[in-house]
Amino acid sequence: MRRLPLDFRDQYFGCEIELTGINRATAAQTLADLFGPRAEHSGGGYDAYRVKDLDGKEWKIVRDGSIHPECRRRSVLIGETYKVELNSPKLEYSEMEKLQEVVRSLRRAGGIVNDSCGMHVHVDASKHTPQSLKNVLSIMYSKEDILFAALKVNPARIDSYCQAVDEPILEEIRKLPSGASMDQLKDRWYQGRDGSDYHYHSSRYRACNMHSVFYHGTIEWRLFNSTLHAGEAKANIILAMAISAQGINQKYTQFRKTPIGDNPAFTFRTFLLRLGLIGPEYKNVRMHLLKNLPGDKAWRHDKSQYPSNQPRPRTGEAR
């Protein structure tokens, strides 16, 4: 029996959003004001605060050392407490609005982002196979140049926290037979030295992080700049979920780069439509993902060149 394609919305997701402008206690209280009744300060190495929402799911505010702290109020002493990371719980697509309201609340409380802040999106990997994970990596390799351009990824982050796909490792992974096991894929990812039990393994710092599959059970996308715009956050999450589903639904992928070309907006819009982001439901998602790219998203070439756009010859004088 032919397997039905996976709807990308039928996947769990979560995210980490880095911010500053407010301290961790304020961020935690903001969540408590939204969900009630209070924030629990559990401390520890990440100085964690925990808040449960109305569904009993736990949201966390933690420290992230990579953030450059800022505050718009000059009278406030800025320090380590202004390095803030929001960790969402495991969410269903139907809970997207809940996440968006958290993002809006943090912005209203004074939260801001800067070039040191990133957003990481996790998509549940439980429906994936070695072949589908191979497909996801190949899709990322193929599209990463235009993805980096569309998302305006900070070059400093590309060099450090969200590097491009490791081409030699991907080549080895693609050589695995169609019936390869997850252990074989893991062996190729770690190059024969299993690091799946080490949280900060160096292989995690990829735009598409497969270390997270073996450590957390999720595929992690690390290439997004942080945002406290609810629509942008939603667009980032949907893009990651759609690529994940495409990896599951495709039988195979090609090992080649997609050229950006002279009309990047059209090239990327075509990719988004192939991911299933079609119609009015995803109009704003497409808008956010395309807004940084030059070109005409509706026409591959100069639209005046198409016969349908040529002026019609006059067939006779008006009477």
Question: What is each model feature region?
Answer:
Residues M1-I112, S126-R319:
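C-terminal accessory/tail domains of diverse enzymes
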Residues N114-S116:
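Active-site histidine-anchored catalytic micro-motif
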